[in-house]
Amino acid sequence: MGMKKNRPRRGSLAFSPRKRAKKLVPKIRSWPADKKVGLQAFPVYKAGTTHALLIENNPKSPNNGQEVFTPVTVLETPDVTVAGIRLYEKTTKGLKALTEVWAEQLDGDLGRKLTLAKKEEKKTADALDAVVEKATEVRAIVHTNPKTTGIPKKKPEVVEIRIGGSSVAERLAYAKEILGKTLAIGDVFEAGEIIDTLAITKGKGFQGSVKRWGIKVQFGKHQRKGVGRHTGSIGPWRPRRVMWTVPLPGQMGFHQRTEYNKRILKLGSEGAEITPKGGFLNYGAVKNGYVVVKGTVQGPAKRLVVLRGSVRAAEDKFGLPEVAYISTESKQGN
């Protein structure tokens, strides 16, 4: 096809305004229509990337049955704690919270993040049964346990996760069962499953138009004057304002992004078997369970990533390929 003659920018305006995300915890705006009872997402931490050799299982591929080099991402999966349950009612203005119940015993580090209610102020499970007829959604309030990882912090992240199921009563029964307990990645996902990843991307700071939007670098007179890396025209004389569509300098990176249809290649409980020699760059050793995802995952090392059941997965024609080898060689450049 070749290059377009008119190319004012290389970035999509659908993501505007490109400003910094408010929180490091991504906001989950949609959920899969899954009737399986259980959590529909799981928060993890990005450790780093490596490569693997997979046995190609596509019969139409010229590499069928052969080893194929594939980049993979390793995510550490410390157990999460279910701290509370929240019920929602569907109204004309969106979801409305009906009530919430918290576990009797809460981790002391959770008080670094939230103002915890006193014991005599906490609601019991009877408060859930009183409004269950109005409820349309059941969600679990879970928090991570970063102190069990190599990340130097104690304050946990709090994530609200929808509970799937065929009926509200079935979801609520499961929520009561897991309240106050810890869950592992194996309780939510399994190897071969297709998932989505939600995270805040790596921040780049304030960048110019060429790097931020991919506009053309001007040569000739503009370059000789030292103004080659700027927008040639930012608009007409009238109307006397600059349109929001003009590619201008500004914040680049640190945005929430969702990547769809990633495949889980492997789940494990021993982090030592996946940690490369010398540890992952800017992360260190994996101390808990882990999950290996095919391809890349947005964000730098130590970034919180939410794994969600796929909301737009196509038919899985070939299934999980055989993993022949996962590299644990040093990433230090030695």
Curated annotation (Swiss-Prot):
Oligomer and partners: Part of the 50S ribosomal subunit. Forms a cluster with proteins L14 and L24e.
Matching PANTHER family: 60S RIBOSOMAL PROTEIN L3-RELATED (PTHR11363), LARGE RIBOSOMAL SUBUNIT PROTEIN UL3 (PTHR11363:SF5)
Name of the protein in question: Large ribosomal subunit protein uL3
Record GO cellular component, one term: cytosolic large ribosomal subunit
GO biological process: translation
Gene Ontology MF term list: rRNA binding; structural constituent of ribosome
Lineage: Archaea, Methanobacteriati, Methanobacteriota, Methanomada group, Methanococci
Start and end residues of each stretch annotated as Disordered: 1-21
Biased composition (Basic residues): 1-10
Keywords noted in UniProt: Ribonucleoprotein, Ribosomal protein, RNA-binding, rRNA-binding
Role summary: One of the primary rRNA binding proteins, it binds directly near the 3'-end of the 23S rRNA, where it nucleates assembly of the 50S subunit.
Similarity field: Belongs to the universal ribosomal protein uL3 family.
